[in-house]
Amino acid sequence: MTKKLLVMAGGTGGHVFPAIAVVRELQQQGWEIRWLGTKDRMEADLVPKHGIPIEFIQISGLKGKGIKALLTAPFAILRAVLQAKKIINAYKPDAVLGMGGYVSGPGGIAAKLCGVPVILHEQNAVVGLTNVWLSKIARRTLQAFPTAFPNAEVVGNPVRQDLFEIAPPEQRFAEKGYPINILVMGGSQGALVINKTVLEVAKVLGQNVFISHQVGKGKLAGVEEVYQATGNGIASEFIDDMKAAYEWADLVICRSGALTVCEIAAAGLPAIFVPFQHKDRQQFLNAEYLAQVGAAMIIEQQDFTPESLLKALEPLIADRQKLTEMAIKARAKATPLAAKRVAEVIVENSL
């Protein structure tokens, strides 16, 4: 009989893309996959585009929703659990994989009530509240970084396998001269502080660098004009081919979401991280995974000025060997078998 998996993941690419990487591993083994998500988040469009059937429940976050939302939250959660329970009873999965997002909470509770094993994966270096609760009912808990749970197995973050096809840094960087290719990623929303600061620095650095700057949707205004004037960069709203972008780059400047950190390690690239300022310092702790081994630098957002960025960049631009050493250290922290290992744990713990 065909084995079945129900995947619970949604909200952001940091949850959805690692889950898709695991799905591909299990599909190769003949597993049938179905997804549990919400209609108003990115998984509603993204998952069907990858050929995966998706079911929906109604659930949303409570942050910043006010007193009314807090008072009605128990009823909303109960409704979502009952919706998920109905889907699980109809689909009859052999295992449920929780990868984060609002959907994982009620989905995990419903799976437990239905007697279906829950396998949990935490992508960030600090564990989210939903996964703290779910870890108490999960059959197995896995983590990307060693700092989230004290006793969970560390498997890394499942990332796209094509990134591991990129040649090793010592080979890629061997014949390179100038300019230094800098890949700047403002994220899908466009991090205003990164965009503004990099533009100021581009005016100073001249032809020693060439910048490929992903600014985010609707953020091109004024940016293209700067690079036309400086002649040392190009701007785009999105990057369609991330593998090609990583292969081209000598250095990355970006936020430090869990998936981004692990992709940069997989590609073998030095980075300057500007963590988003979460209360739990989630992105800072993600960035430390590479910074602690000398593969990356961290500049906190409140300190991220043209002066601090120039101070970080100038020694790297002057010393290509330093960039190569950082890149080699980054590649050493990659986890090419993460998706395979998560898939193995699902198989081992399925009904």
Swiss-Prot record:
**What is the top EC class of this enzyme, as a single word?**
transferase
Q: What is its main location?
A: membrane
Q: Which reactions are catalysed by this chain?
A: di-trans,octa-cis-undecaprenyl diphospho-N-acetyl-alpha-D-muramoyl-L-alanyl-D-glutamyl-meso-2,6-diaminopimeloyl-D-alanyl-D-alanine + UDP-N-acetyl-alpha-D-glucosamine = di-trans,octa-cis-undecaprenyl diphospho-[N-acetyl-alpha-D-glucosaminyl-(1->4)]-N-acetyl-alpha-D-muramoyl-L-alanyl-D-glutamyl-meso-2,6-diaminopimeloyl-D-alanyl-D-alanine + UDP + H(+)
Q: Which family does it belong to?
A: Belongs to the glycosyltransferase 28 family. MurG subfamily.
Which HAMAP family does the UniProt record give? MurG
Its annotated function is as follows: Cell wall formation. Catalyzes the transfer of a GlcNAc subunit on undecaprenyl-pyrophosphoryl-MurNAc-pentapeptide (lipid intermediate I) to form undecaprenyl-pyrophosphoryl-MurNAc-(pentapeptide)GlcNAc (lipid intermediate II).
Q: How does it sit in the membrane?
A: Peripheral membrane protein
Q: Where in the cell is it found?
A: Cell inner membrane
Q: What is its EC number?
A: 2.4.1.227
Return the GO cellular component terms, semicolon-separated: plasma membrane
Pathway where this protein functions: Cell wall biogenesis; peptidoglycan biosynthesis
Which keywords does the record carry? Cell cycle, Cell division, Cell inner membrane, Cell membrane, Cell shape, Cell wall biogenesis/degradation, Glycosyltransferase, Membrane, Peptidoglycan synthesis, Transferase
Q: List the disulfide bonds.
A: none
What is the designated name of this protein?
UDP-N-acetylglucosamine--N-acetylmuramyl-(pentapeptide) pyrophosphoryl-undecaprenol N-acetylglucosamine transferase
A Gene Ontology molecular-function term?
UDP-N-acetyl-D-glucosamine:N-acetylmuramoyl-L-alanyl-D-glutamyl-meso-2,6-diaminopimelyl-D-alanyl-D-alanine-diphosphoundecaprenol 4-beta-N-acetylglucosaminlytransferase activity
Q: Where does UDP-N-acetyl-alpha-D-glucosamine bind?
A: 12-14, 124, 160, 188, 239, 258-263, 283
Pfam families named in the record: Glyco_tran_28_C (PF04101), Glyco_transf_28 (PF03033)
Record GO biological process:
carbohydrate metabolic process; cell division; cell wall organization; lipid glycosylation; peptidoglycan biosynthetic process; regulation of cell shape
